[in-house]
Amino acid sequence: MTEAFKQQIEEEARQAVTELLAQAKLRKGDVFVVGCSSSEIVGGHIGKDSSLEAAQAVYAGIAPVLAQQGIWLAAQCCEHLNRAIIIEREAAEKYGWEEVCVVPRPHAGGSWATTCWKQFKDPIAVEEIRAHAGIDIGGTLIGMHLRRVAVPVRLSLSKIGEANILCARTRPKLIGGERAKYTEED
């Protein structure tokens, strides 16, 4: 992988997370899930061409932006680990998510989860979470880890590297019927 392509991936990842955060209106302590197929980023087929370099470039673009705002990064593993989540122990404890025993590797968990495991201060794996927003890079199906109700968010870019991206924020369910009010101004 060329240096120029790594820089492109990093910048696209940074831009995507920055744009999504601007629309999602997350608060300090919220959770942001990222599913990332490094294979798709480099133009391969999901699960077939894992690239630590691509995953590291995505991490370099996303992690500092989230850290600056005090938002927890949750890294979704691949299908071989049942799409488990790698997250900092402190975040999992805050939200009451139960730890499971597994350490991701590039071909069992994916390069993205492996990269995050190595970069996090005190990483653990959990089976499921309810994140406040997230980015799906390359068709990794993050929906199972989003809070209800997920709201699609369009960005100015539609790819990171060669991988398509889909983004979502979440909002509380609207309840109550015709007399209900949903804002203070109503």
Enumerate the language-model features and the residues they cover.
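Glycine-rich, aromatic-bearing surface loops/beta-hairpins
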Residues: 114, 118-186
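Solvent-exposed alpha-helices and their adjacent loops that cap or buttress functional pockets
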Residues: 24-26, 108, 154-159
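N-terminal glycine-/serine-/threonine-rich phosphate-binding loop
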Residues: 1-32, 52-65
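Active-site histidine-anchored catalytic micro-motif
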Residues: 41-46, 50-57, 64-83, 108
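Generic secondary-structure signature for well-ordered alpha-helical cores
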Residues: 18, 22-25, 63-71, 117-125, ...
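Non-catalytic beta/alpha edge segments that cap or flank active sites
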Residues: 4, 29, 42, 67-70, ...
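Ligand-binding beta-strand-loop-alpha-helix segment within the catalytic cores
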Residues: 69-132, 137-138
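Short glycine-rich phosphate-binding loop at a beta-alpha junction
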Residues: 30-35, 73-74
